[in-house]
């Protein structure tokens, strides 16, 4: 039975944050003084597995593991393997900064991860450091991308948050890199999520401005729109030769009318909309001994409270991206 909200949207996709911690500090994601929650506040893998089983039973078929950085959570492959065995699970994917993929890519594939999205905001070492902090480098992320390709975690999607005057000049280089390696490259508009996200909105570039830079790099005739289903996400895709690029325009062309997703935070809150403050506590009833039927009722009630649209243009989200799972 499909999970349908009051606006007749089928909710089929859950983003699951397994950790608020991250080994990088990207300037649009978290401010330097921001501290992560204590691990004791996170759901255990046993608790998480029970909740994910309820979501699968209710009609969620696609799961994406996120963070923070999900690969800093020990024994993640064990969680994946258990999730992969659940009836109704169609796909498990992963969002990562790529730094730890050379170590874990093969095990993740064997456990049941189908594909990965990897963040790469700059190919230039100094630009990378300016955006992402002192940990990691473009070469280390590239190594993660190659490890994902070798392990068969495909298609590999590379996400670039585009900021005017910061990294927008690298768009042509990113397109070339994606074409050389057969990657799907996605450009993402900045969003006012958390203090860090609000601070970078002065560098906001719309998807139209981003696409214009792509056209300048490859020629207008070379950028061919792709129609038809391209997965459960909100990106609009274009073909450039044998590669693909996409744009995610949460600000300039929101996709709320077709939103199919919710988010489960590491501390057990169900976030109904990335741009709203609505959230439902699942950890407390879980730890107080709620039955499966009681958990199902809480989730079903939450789905009907999912808002019609985000309020990014009216107010910013106070929660940091690391606390929301992206």
Curated annotation (Swiss-Prot):
Involved pathway(s): Cofactor biosynthesis; molybdopterin biosynthesis
Q: Which residues bind GTP?
A: 15, 64, 95, 157, 261-263
Which residues are noted in the entry as [4Fe-4S] cluster 1-binding? 22, 26, 29
- State its Enzyme Commission number(s): 4.1.99.22
GO BP, one example?
Mo-molybdopterin cofactor biosynthetic process
Domain of life, per lineage: Bacteria
Question: Which residues are noted in the entry as [4Fe-4S] cluster 2-binding?
Answer: 256, 259, 273
Keywords tagged on the record: 4Fe-4S, GTP-binding, Iron, Iron-sulfur, Lyase, Metal-binding, Molybdenum cofactor biosynthesis, Nucleotide-binding, S-adenosyl-L-methionine
Catalyzed reactions: GTP + AH2 + S-adenosyl-L-methionine = (8S)-3',8-cyclo-7,8-dihydroguanosine 5'-triphosphate + 5'-deoxyadenosine + L-methionine + A + H(+)
- List the cofactors: [4Fe-4S] cluster
InterPro entries recorded = Aldolase_TIM, Elp3/MiaA/NifB-like_rSAM, MoaA, MoaA_NifB_PqqE_Fe-S-bd_CS, MoaA_twitch, MoCo_biosynth_MoaA/MoaC, rSAM
Query: How is the cofactor bound, in the record's words?
Result: Binds 2 [4Fe-4S] clusters. Binds 1 [4Fe-4S] cluster coordinated with 3 cysteines and an exchangeable S-adenosyl-L-methionine and 1 [4Fe-4S] cluster coordinated with 3 cysteines and the GTP-derived substrate.
Provide the GO MF annotations for this entry: 4 iron, 4 sulfur cluster binding; cyclic pyranopterin monophosphate synthase activity; GTP 3',8'-cyclase activity; GTP binding; metal ion binding; S-adenosyl-L-methionine binding
Signal peptide start and end residues: none
Which SMART domains is this protein grouped with? Elp3
| Residue span, Radical SAM core domain | 6-227
Its quaternary structure?
A: Monomer and homodimer.
According to UniProt, the name of this protein is GTP 3',8-cyclase
Q: Taxonomy-wise, where does this protein's organism fall, top ranks first?
A: Bacteria, Pseudomonadati, Pseudomonadota, Alphaproteobacteria, Magnetococcales
């Amino acid at each position: 039975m499909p999970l349908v909200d009051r606006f007749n949207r089928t909710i089929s996709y859950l983003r699951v944050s397994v950790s608020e911690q991250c080994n990088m500090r990207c300037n649009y994601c978290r401010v330097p003084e921001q501290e992560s929650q204590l691990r004791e506040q996170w759901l255990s893998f046993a608790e998480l597995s029970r909740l994910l089983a309820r979501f699968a039973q209710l009609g969620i078929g696609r799961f994406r593991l996120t963070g923070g950085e999900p690969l800093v959570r020990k024994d993640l492959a064990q969680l994946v393997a258990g999730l992969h065995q659940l009836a109704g699970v169609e796909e498990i994917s992963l969002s990562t900064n790529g730094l730890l993929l050379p170590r874990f890519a093969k095990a993740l594939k064997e456990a049941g991860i189908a594909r990965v999205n990897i963040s790469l905001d700059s190919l230039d070492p100094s630009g990378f450091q300016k955006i992402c902090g002192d940990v990691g480098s473009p070469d280390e992320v590239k190594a993660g991308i190659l490890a994902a390709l070798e392990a068969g975690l495909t298609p590999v999607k590379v996400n670039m948050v585009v900021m005017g005057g910061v990294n927008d000049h690298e768009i042509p280089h990113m397109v070339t890199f994606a074409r050389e390696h057969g990657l799907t490259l996605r450009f993402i508009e900045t969003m006012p999520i958390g203090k860090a996200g609000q601070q970078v909105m002065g560098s906001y570039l719309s998807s139209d401005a981003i696409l214009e830079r792509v056209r300048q790099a490859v020629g207008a005739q070379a950028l061919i729109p792709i129609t038809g289903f391209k997965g459960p996400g909100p990106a609009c895709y274009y073909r450039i030769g044998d590669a693909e690029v996409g744009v995610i325009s949460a600000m300039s062309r929101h996709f709320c009318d077709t939103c199919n997703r919710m988010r489960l935070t590491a501390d057990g809150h169900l976030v109904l909309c990335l741009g709203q403050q609505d959230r439902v506590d699942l950890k407390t009833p879980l730890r107080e001994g709620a039955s499966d039927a009681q958990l199902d009722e809480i989730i079903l009630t939450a789905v009907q409270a999912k808002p019609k649209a985000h309020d990014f243009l009216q107010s910013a989200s106070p929660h940091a991206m690391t606390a929301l799972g992206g």
